[in-house]
Every structure is written in structure tokens, then in C-alpha cells.
């Protein structure tokens, strides 16, 4: 092979390699090569994020649907329970209405009403309600021909609840007022009081049976009182009554003698002290005199008073009972009702006048001698035209309240009250 030709081939292949490398380097410089390599990874990441977002949305929708389904199931269960309760209540109401003569409408009437509600009001006409004059008759419950006339509606009776024995006979009720409708007329004609088929039970008359219980008064033994313990339960009231009866009898002291202070006894009473009975009797309104005003006496101090020194004279008011004897008012063994304060201090002598010590002497001391003139007086003398120069201090006259040697100290003792 020609060496020149082989050299040109090698040079041509080198030039192509250089061109490819140059282009790759240019793309690397421009960033096109990196974008091309990362584009697939970026696209994969975007797809993954979108899938994750869609998955989260689907999960949220599923949770919401699950909650709604749970709520719907709870609602359905509650509706079923309510339907059962309503059906039971409807059955009870139907039985209650049927018990008092209520009859439900026939199926034909309900089907007719259903057709009328579904169809237009102008074209919907029921077969049974073609004539307007028969509407009132059709509104009433249909009665079979073979059956007897049923009992009309009536108010509940005690017999309906099994309380026949508490039924009280009643007079015939006042007839209702006539109305236009035939239904009200028929109902008023067949009232329970006028209907001969209705039997009004009379009040049962039965004798009071005393077999079950006995109405017996309580025995005295239950309260601790009996014929054997009667004398032991007597109180002071009975003793006082017995004491009054003994006083009123001639056995009591006569001629101003005092009642015995020993214990008074009777056959059926306890021994009661005599002074206690006398004191209780003196407290009675019939034997009480008006009390004297008390006198107050303080030992060691005499208070001059404008009133007379004579004692107050007691005034004896007349007793309410003229037949009362002086023995009823004697009270030797009892303490008097009024205590005189003078009697408590009779043993005490009049106290001596208190001695006045040196610190209690209220004589006025001699006034001090002024040797220097104060500054405020000097200022006053400076502006006084009558005095050219200050003069010697003269003896000042005594002020009010200063006493001489021969003057009594009575007025000086009260100088604090000036």
C-alpha cells in the first residue's frame, strides 16, 4: 500500500476524532451534556412524586368513603331501632284505640287517597266518592250487614283498668247541644249514661273488717305510768296543791305564827321543804307587795345628794284577797325579796378624810425672777415710741389663780379646770 495514502487515512480518522471530541467538549462547556444525562433521572423522580401524590389522594378519598359508610351504617341501625320502636308504639296505640271503638280505614279508601295524591286534582276521581251527597256517609266507618251495631266512642271508665270496685254511681250527664252534623247528633243520642247496654256499677258496700288490725288505745304501762307506779310519778305541782290545802285547813298556824319550816308530807306525795313552798307562794301575784327602791352605798365615799336624807317610806298596797291572814306573809326562814344595801355595810365606820401628801399639795409656787429680756420683747420695745430705751423689769402683778400665803388652797386646787 502506498505510505502516502495510509498517512492520509490516519490523518482523516484523527480529524474526525478531534471533531467529535471538540463537539463533546463544547457541549460539556454549555451544560447540554449534564442535562441530557440527568433528564431521565429527573423524569423518573417527577413520575414518582406524581404517583405518591395520587396515592395520597386515593387514600384520603378511601378514608372519607369509609367514614361515610360507617356513619351510614350507624344511621341505618338507628333507623331500624326507631322503626321497631315506632311499630311497637303503633301497635299499642292501635290496640288502645280499638279498645275504645276506633276502627281503621279500609284498604280501598287508602288506595283511593293514594291515587288521588299521585294524579292531577282535576282528573282524579274516586269511584266511591262520585256523588257529593254521599261523602258524609262514606267518611264514617263501614259496618258489615251481618254484624251488630258497634259501640260508639266513649270516655275511659274505671272498669277498663280493672278498678270496678272503686266506681261511683254518677247521674245522667247533660245532653250535648245539637249540631248540624249527623255524626254529633248520633253520638249525643247514644251517650253511655242513656245507653241501656252500659251497666254502671254501684259503689260496693262492705262492712269494715277489724280482723286484720285492732284499734286499741295505748296502754299506760308503755309510758311508765300505771296504777302501781302512779304515786311514784307525782311531781312538785301536786305537792304544792296539797300544801295549799293544808294551809287553808285549820291545822295551820293561827295567831300570827309562822308556818313550819320542816318538810311537809302527805300520803301520796314526796317530802317538800317548807321554805321552798313559802318562797314559791310568796312569788304568787296575790301575795306580792310592791318592791322598795334599792339604796346604793359605797364604803369609803359619800356622795352629796339634793334629795332628803330620810329613808324612803314603803307603801303597803292592799292585798287582792281580803281574807288572807298575816301568817301567809310571814317569812322568817326565807331570804327577803329586797336587799337593803345599807344593812350590808352597817358594821363599817365612817372613813377618815384622806391625807394629802407633799406631791398632792396644790399651792402655787413663787414666780421666777426675770433677769434677761427675751428677744421677742426687745423687738416689741424697739418699735414702741413711748419707750426710748429699755427700762428695768418691774414686778409683774400676780396672774389669776396665784394665791398669797393666807389664801385658801381650794381655788388653787381647781386650776386645771380654768
Swiss-Prot record:
Modified residues (Phosphothreonine): 190, 217, 298, 364
Subcellular compartments: Cytoplasm, Cytoskeleton, Spindle; Chromosome, Centromere, Kinetochore; Cytoplasm, Cytoskeleton, Microtubule organizing center, Centrosome
Modified residues (Phosphoserine): 34, 119-120, 139, 155, 159, 290, 325, 353
Keyword Transport included in the entry's annotation: no
Stretches for region Binds the NDC80 complex: 102-417
Main location: cytoplasm
Gene3D superfamilies in alphabetical order: 6.10.250.1400
Entry's family note: Belongs to the SKA3 family.
Function comment: Component of the SKA complex, a microtubule plus end-binding complex of the outer kinetochore that stabilizes spindle microtubule-kinetochore attachments, promotes alignment of chromosomes at the mitotic spindle equator (chromosome congression) and assists suppression of the spindle assembly checkpoint. Kinetochores, consisting of a centromere-associated inner segment and a microtubule-contacting outer segment, play a crucial role in chromosome segregation by mediating the physical connection between centromeric DNA and spindle microtubules.
Oligomer and partners: Component of the SKA complex, composed of SKA1, SKA2 and SKA3. The SKA complex is a homodimer organized around a central W-shaped coiled-coil structure, formed by the interacting domains of SKA1, SKA2, and SKA3, each end of the 'W' is extended further by the C-terminal microtubule-binding domains of SKA1 and SKA3; the complex forms extended structures on microtubules. Interacts with the NDC80-NUF2 heterodimer of the NDC80 complex (via coiled coils); the interaction localizes the SKA complex to the kinetochore and is required to establish kinetochore-microtubule end-on attachments.
Name under which the protein is recorded: SKA complex subunit 3
Organism: Rattus norvegicus (Rat)
Amino acid at each position: 500500500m502506498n505510505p502516502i495514502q495510509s498517512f492520509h487515512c490516519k490523518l482523516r480518522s484523527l480529524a474526525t476524532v478531534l471533531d467529535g471530541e471538540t463537539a463533546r467538549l463544547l457541549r460539556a462547556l454549555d451544560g447540554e451534556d449534564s442535562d441530557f444525562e440527568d433528564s431521565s433521572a429527573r423524569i423518573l423522580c417527577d413520575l414518582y412524586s406524581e404517583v405518591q401524590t395520587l396515592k395520597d389522594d386515593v387514600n384520603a378519598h378511601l378514608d372519607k368513603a369509609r367514614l361515610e359508610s360507617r356513619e351510614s351504617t350507624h344511621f341505618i341501625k338507628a333507623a331500624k331501632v326507631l322503626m321497631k320502636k315506632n311499630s311497637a308504639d303503633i301497635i299499642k296505640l292501635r290496640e288502645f284505640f280499638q279498645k275504645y271503638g276506633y276502627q281503621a280505614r279500609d284498604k280501598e279508601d287508602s288506595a283511593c287517597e293514594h291515587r288521588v295524591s299521585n294524579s292531577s286534582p282535576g282528573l282524579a276521581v274516586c269511584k266511591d266518592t262520585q256523588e257529593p251527597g254521599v261523602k258524609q256517609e262514606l267518611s264514617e266507618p263501614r259496618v258489615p250487614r251481618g254484624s251488630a251495631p258497634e259501640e260508639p266512642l266513649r270516655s275511659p271508665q274505671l272498669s277498663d283498668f280493672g278498678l270496678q270496685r272503686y266506681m261511683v254511681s254518677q247521674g245522667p250527664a247533660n245532653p250535648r247541644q245539637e249540631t248540624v252534623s249527623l255524626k254529633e247528633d248520633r253520638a249525643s243520642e247514644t251517650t253511655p249514661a242513656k245507653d241501656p247496654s252500659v251497666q254502671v256499677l254501684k259503689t260496693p258496700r262492705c262492712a269494715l273488717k277489724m280482723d286484720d288490725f285492732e284499734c286499741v288505745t295505748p296502754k299506760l304501762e308503755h309510758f311508765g305510768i300505771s296504777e302501781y307506779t302512779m304515786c311514784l310519778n307525782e311531781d312538785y305541782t301536786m305537792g304544792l296543791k296539797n300544801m295549799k290545802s293544808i294551809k287553808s285547813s285549820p291545822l295551820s298556824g293561827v295567831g300570827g305564827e309562822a308556818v313550819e319550816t320542816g318538810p311537809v308530807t302527805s300520803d301520796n306525795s314526796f317530802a317538800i321543804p317548807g321554805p321552798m313552798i313559802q318562797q314559791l307562794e310568796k312569788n304568787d301575784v296575790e301575795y306580792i307587795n310592791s318592791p322598795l327602791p334599792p339604796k346604793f352605798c359605797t364604803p369609803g365615799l359619800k356622795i352629796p345628794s339634793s334629795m332628803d336624807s330620810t329613808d324612803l317610806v314603803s307603801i303597803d298596797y292592799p292585798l287582792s284577797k281580803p281574807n288572807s291572814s298575816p301568817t301567809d306573809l310571814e317569812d322568817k326562814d326565807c331570804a327577803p325579796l329586797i336587799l337593803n344595801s345599807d344593812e350590808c355595810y352597817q358594821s363599817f365606820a365612817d372613813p377618815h378624810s384622806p391625807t394629802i401628801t407633799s406631791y398632792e399639795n396644790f399651792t402655787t409656787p413663787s414666780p421666777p425672777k426675770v433677769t434677761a429680756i427675751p428677744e421677742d420683747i426687745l423687738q416689741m420695745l424697739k418699735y414702741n415710741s413711748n419707750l426710748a430705751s429699755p427700762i428695768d423689769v418691774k414686778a409683774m402683778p400676780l396672774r389669776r389663780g396665784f394665791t398669797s400665803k393666807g389664801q385658801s388652797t381650794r381655788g388653787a386646787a381647781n386650776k386645771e379646770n380654768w
